Amino acid sequence: VREIALDTQAATTVAVVDDGRVIARAHNDSGRHHAESITPLVREALEAAGLPAQLADAGIDRVLVGTGPAPFTGLRAGLVSARVLAAVAGVPAYGVSALDVIARQGLDLLAPDARVYAIADARRRELYWGSYLAAGPDDVTLEGRLEVGDVSTLLGAMRAAPGLVVAGAPIPAHSADALAHADIGPQVSLDPAVMSRIVATRLSRGEEDRLHTNPLYLRRPDIQGQPTARL
């Protein structure tokens, strides 16, 4: 199975995944200009993998995309691009929350019965976070729902149900002091191969409804007048 995986939660990352293994990757570290950078990054990743730069000729079987949570503009660009890429290649597009991927990566490094709190920077001195348990070796179960709020809300949840914080990047500076005495687990970089594992597992269970490409904004966009419920 050959996949294009892309994520625009913060920077823009495109990877080619072949049978669960990342064989090429391209990224733009800027948190801006997501829409403009995706197509060149796709071509760069395909060429680095030794594949035709034209997506329709590259033997892609599916397109994977991170569904957030993330700010409106970058997330929308990623999801729209994933749907367009899938249409061009004539293949399905599947979405996975970046926090699901971060949680699974953390659990890969911990005891199988661990609870983790996957976090990401939500800006405005806030965090996106969710509490997770393992669902077998390749998937996760979200306890409750994904949240957005200041670090005190996360710490309150951790007092009620202890677990380890797993960050998908360095812990945001605005929350680092408050989390200094919390139980900190691994810090990871989002791995497209883990996204692929989650997708494969959910498809094998007939759980396509958990692979939708709807955006997880969690709050209203900074740009007023834009829709939040759907693209």
Regions found by a protein language model. Name each.
Residues 1-69:
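N-terminal beta-alpha supersecondary unit
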Residues 21-27, 33, 92-191, 210-211, ...:
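Surface "functional belts" at beta-alpha junctions
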Residues 40, 44, 83, 87, ...:
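Short, well-ordered alpha-helices that flank and scaffold nucleotide-derived cofactor binding pockets
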Residues 47-57, 86-96, 111-114:
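Phosphate-handling active-site elements
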Residues 64-93, 98:
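DPxDG-like acidic metal-binding loop motif
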Residues 186-204:
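Short, flexible loop segments at boundaries between secondary-structure elements
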